[in-house]
């Protein structure tokens, strides 16, 4: 690929969603404009998933690439035009007749994703067992939740080197090997079935009355109906599964384990595993992001996994050497004074300009290294020139004082004089 083609491809990536409004910042954001390497909006600093960007096709390409060269190729289809694998997302449309005064109207509900099972009644049951605010009904809060989780749990830059910022050939090779490894050893998709169906097939199921690793005996005809109802328990919450309710199985975990639909969550972030896509490691379920975090350091600047042997650690976070930069101006911070603002490093000039509190005495910004006095939302330089009685100008450092909004007084008398 020549340089011109590469630049065109990069430009198109940065044009995607350009100008889309931020759902979080509203009118405070001028519209989405992707930062060159941070994966956030340059205007409001929110992620692309917080903006009203139509990403369904792009997300389907991302998940399609994830399933490529795995046993889940039945969930993808390759476009004839470019051969790019596309996720065959299962969309479920339910129609319910609604009685009206004169005739019967049809109420249609579209789920942007549903479990790919032949039994639609089972898929409907699955959806009803999810919290309402997480059901991916088109145009709803749940659909927006799914969109955010697709972006958060399965970042494209965790599997596609072309989505990363200036990787070396060695880093590209290491990343490709890493992706190949997690596809073969950890990646999976949950399967929705009735526990009784698995029992009838002779599969092992988890028995809450025994050890977690001890499968329940199946096919015993002398069990009472009550015993059958308490035969299955959720691997996550340990509560009993109700008879007739669907359960989720994860093949990599073994079919002796099952989960309630609302309990099929990442063990790190606690969020529903989007589209039941999971990663299994050491007896735990992970989303894609947190599985990768358990294997590789992640740069707090660009959000990419670090495949270089050389990187820096600061403020309990990892950073590419080139990405340990001021969050406001992008200047490299190595060897410079910086201040953490909402867990982001900011250089001293930007801190003073954009974030520093203003002294109530001199009305100038307070430098980060300078001592200050703070009361409620008001601050002063801790100096004899600034922290003074608002009436008589007596220095109040180390003294008792009476605060009144942005003023301080040394005595009741001074306060009365200014009333």
From Swiss-Prot:
SMART domains: LIM
Keyword Nucleotidyltransferase in annotation: no
Keywords assigned: Cell junction, Cytoplasm, LIM domain, Metal-binding, Repeat, Zinc
CDD domains in UniProt: LIM1_Testin (cd09413), LIM2_Testin (cd09416), LIM3_Testin (cd09419), PET_testin (cd09829)
GO molecular function: zinc ion binding
Listed name of the protein: Testin
Similarity annotation: Belongs to the prickle / espinas / testin family.
GO CC terms of this entry: cytoplasm; focal adhesion; protein-containing complex
Chain spans, region Disordered: 133-164, 199-222
Entry annotated with the keyword Cytoplasm: yes
Subcellular location: Cytoplasm; Cell junction, Focal adhesion
Bias kind Basic and acidic residues: ranges: 155-164
Source domain of life: Eukaryota
LIM zinc-binding domain boundaries: 232-295, 297-357, 360-419
Organism per entry: Rattus norvegicus
Alphabetical GO biological process terms: negative regulation of cell population proliferation
Swiss-Prot/TrEMBL domain comment: The N-terminal and the C-terminal halves of the protein can associate with each other, thereby hindering interactions with ZYX.
Self-association state and partner proteins as the record states: Interacts via LIM domain 1 with ZYX. Interacts (via LIM domain 3) with ENAH and VASP. Interacts with ALKBH4, talin, actin, alpha-actinin, GRIP1 and PXN. Interacts (via LIM domain 2) with ACTL7A (via N-terminus). Heterodimer with ACTL7A; the heterodimer interacts with ENAH to form a heterotrimer.
């Amino acid at each position: 690929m020549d340089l011109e083609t590469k630049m065109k491809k990069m430009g198109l990536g940065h044009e995607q969603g350009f100008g889309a409004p931020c759902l979080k910042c509203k009118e405070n954001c001028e519209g989405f404009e992707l930062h060159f390497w941070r994966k956030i909006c340059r205007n409001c600093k929110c992620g692309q998933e917080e903006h009203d960007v139509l990403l369904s096709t792009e997300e389907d390409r991302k998940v399609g690439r994830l399933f490529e060269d795995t046993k889940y190729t039945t969930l993808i289809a390759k476009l004839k035009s470019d051969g790019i694998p596309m996720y065959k997302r299962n969309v479920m449309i339910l129609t319910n007749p609604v009685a009206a005064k004169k005739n019967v109207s049809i109420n249609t509900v579209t789920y942007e994703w549903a479990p790919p099972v032949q039994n639609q009644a089972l898929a409907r049951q699955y959806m009803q067992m999810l919290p309402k605010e997480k059901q991916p009904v088109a145009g709803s809060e749940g659909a927006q939740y799914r969109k955010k989780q697709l972006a958060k749990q399965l970042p494209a830059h965790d599997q596609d080197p072309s989505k990363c910022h200036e990787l070396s050939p060695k880093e590209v090779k290491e990343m490709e090997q890493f992706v190949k490894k997690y596809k073969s050893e950890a990646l999976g998709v949950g399967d929705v079935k009735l526990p009784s169906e698995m029992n009838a097939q002779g599969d092992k199921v988890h028995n809450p009355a025994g050890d977690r690793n001890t499968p329940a005996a199946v096919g015993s005809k002398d069990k009472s109906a009550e015993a059958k109802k308490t035969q299955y328990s959720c691997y996550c919450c340990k509560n009993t599964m109700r008879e007739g309710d669907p359960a989720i199985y994860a093949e990599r975990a073994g079919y002796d384990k099952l989960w309630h639909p609302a309990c099929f969550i990442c063990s790190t972030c606690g969020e529903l595993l989007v589209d039941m896509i999971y990663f299994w490691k050491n007896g735990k379920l992970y989303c894609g992001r947190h599985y990768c975090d358990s294997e590789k350091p992640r740069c707090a600047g660009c959000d990419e996994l670090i495949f270089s042997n050389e990187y820096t650690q600061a403020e309990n976070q990892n950073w590419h050497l080139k990405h340990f930069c001021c969050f406001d101006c992008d200047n490299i911070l190595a060897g410079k004074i910086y201040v953490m603002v909402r867990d982001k490093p900011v250089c001293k000039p930007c801190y003073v300009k954009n974030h520093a509190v203003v002294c109530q005495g001199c009305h100038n910004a307070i430098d980060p290294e300078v001592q200050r006095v703070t009361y409620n939302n008001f601050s002063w330089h801790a100096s004899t020139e600034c922290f003074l009685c608002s009436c008589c100008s007596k220095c109040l450092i180390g003294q008792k004082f009476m605060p009144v909004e942005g003023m301080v007084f040394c005595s009741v008398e001074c306060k009365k004089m200014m009333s």
